[in-house]
Regions:
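Conserved glycine-rich cofactor-binding loop
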Residues: 9, 16-17, 40
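Substrate-binding pocket helix/loop in short-chain dehydrogenase/reductase
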Residues: 99-100, 107-112, 207
Length: 258
């Protein structure tokens, strides 16, 4: 067990699988008490099992992050029960593929509710607790889709993740005086359940061919930077969005991807 997050309490949304699960496991391995917050209890139970089997500390809370009253209640409950709240990782996300012509407001509302509005809800709920104890960390799993690149059919998702960048910059400025840092990771093609649709449509080998690293990323390769940003080592880093994509966004054209 590591000590980089020893004594810290962290709520990680969407931690039932994929990047969220890997982040929860990594945080617990560094000494944090992890609140596994997930909408699907069975997924969260598996994350909890893996953490406890490795000797880590974690509790499971089933919550729909799109339910803002429930989200606020979760933050207040954990702060009261644990006596502190050091880290929020908003990893939960909503997805949807529709062209601009096909787009409907129900899809827009669903994606923005989880991907953007929940950032505000979590920050508003956590701020009094973090301010009282003298600081904290607020982290978001964003995406390269929107802030850096896009693709057909990703309009709602890309726009929501671009909005996350605006949130990160503004929140970093507003919360810096309270010793609360605000940062995001922008993953590229990471081998998670969320990538299943693209893998089925194009094939993993074809996707990997256009990535300079020639492979998909692993969830653990997002969890590592998350641990760093949550640690004391990153105390002077705020307002940053760090791309982790194996260089996928860099070629001028797929022709130059190698």
């Amino acid at each position: 067990m590591g000590v980089r997050l020893a004594g810290k309490v962290a709520i990680i949304t969407g931690s039932g699988q994929g990047i969220g699960r890997a982040t929860a496991i990594a945080f617990a391995a560094e000494g944090a008490t992890v609140i596994v917050a997930t909408r699907t209890a069975a997924h969260g139970e598996e994350t909890l099992r893996r953490i406890t089997a490795a000797g880590g500390n974690a509790v499971l809370r089933q919550v729909d992050i799109g339910d803002h009253a429930a989200t606020r209640a979760l933050v207040d409950e954990i702060a009261a029960t644990c006596g502190r709240l050091d880290i929020i990782v908003h990893n939960a996300a909503a997805f949807g593929r529709k062209t601009i012509e096909e787009m409907d407001h129900e899809t827009l509302d669903r994606l923005f509710n989880v991907n953007v509005k929940a950032c505000f809800t979590l920050a508003q709920a956590a701020l009094p607790h973090m301010r009282k104890q003298g600081g904290g960390r607020f982290l978001v799993t964003s995406s390269v889709t929107g802030p850096k690149v896009s693709m057909p059919g990703s309009g709602a998702y890309a726009t929501s993740k671009a909005a996350v960048t605006g949130f990160i910059h503004t929140a970093a400025i507003e919360l810096a005086a309270d010793n609360i840092t605000v940062n995001a990771i922008e993953p590229g093609y990471i081998d998670t359940p969320g990538l299943a649709g693209l893998k089925a449509r194009f094939g993993e080998d074809r996707i990997a061919h256009f990535i300079p690293a020639k492979r998909l990323g692993r969830p653990e390769e997002i969890a590592g930077p998350m641990v760093f940003l949550a640690s004391d080592e990153a105390s002077y880093i705020t307002g940053e969005t760090i791309v982790v994509d194996g260089g996928a966004r860099l070629p001028e054209s797929p022709v130059f991807a190698g």
